[in-house]
Amino acid sequence: MGLVIMPDIFGMRPLFDDLVARLAREWNMVVIAIEPFPNQTLSADIAERMACVSLLSDDAVLRDMHEAADALGVDRVGLMGFCMGGMYCHKAARSDRFARISSFYGMIHIPEGWMSATQGDPLTYLEGGNADRVLAIIGSLDPYTPPDQVLELLGVGVTVQEYPEAVHGFAHDVARPAHRAHDAQDAFSRTRDWLLAQ
């Protein structure tokens, strides 16, 4: 099986190089991660990156995800993403290219500052099909995934795994103050099982 990883808003960096190598080794998959801001030179300043999200195009990001999946050279490909990358996982549910999808704390509705003519609403894409392929990993204290929106996810057929004491970004970066080791281990284990399920 293959796996495409959509990084968080900070994009490709050693954290994701290491994650690709680790999951390829431990999960016995062919794994690739892609840069969400290709052909742009951005600093690590989150305000700068937040301002650039509205300039992204859903169609271009989906094209990049498809090309990454094709580059893996396997028929069955899963998708996993974090934060903004998790939001794009929700948007990718409209595609039949990904057999299973796991979104880690992906936005359910497009944040106001990210709205543009090229940015569709994640929940609308999920309503369009294949929501049953999506596992949403959610921290109950995450302001980007409030309880009323989580209910909307459930309402369109997404499988939700909530972690009651977790905030945004609790699983993929051990350097973050929000990191919760036990919850992260559980979330990755559930994601592996989800991706491998037929």
State where each predicted segment sits.
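Gly/Ala-rich beta-loop-alpha elbow adjacent to hydrolase catalytic centers
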Residues: 81-85, 89
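Conserved serine/cysteine hydrolase catalytic core
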Residues: 116-133, 189, 193-195
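Serine-hydrolase catalytic machinery in alpha/beta-hydrolase-like enzymes
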Residues: 1-74, 122, 170-172
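Short beta-strand immediately N-terminal to the catalytic nucleophile in serine-hydrolase-like folds
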Residues: 79-81, 104, 137
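Conserved alpha/beta-hydrolase "acid-adjacent" motif
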Residues: 143-149
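C-terminal catalytic histidine-bearing segment of alpha/beta-hydrolase fold enzymes
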Residues: 157-198
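Short beta-strand/loop motif that positions the catalytic acidic residue
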Residues: 129-130, 136-138, 142, 163
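A conserved short beta-strand
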Residues: 97-112
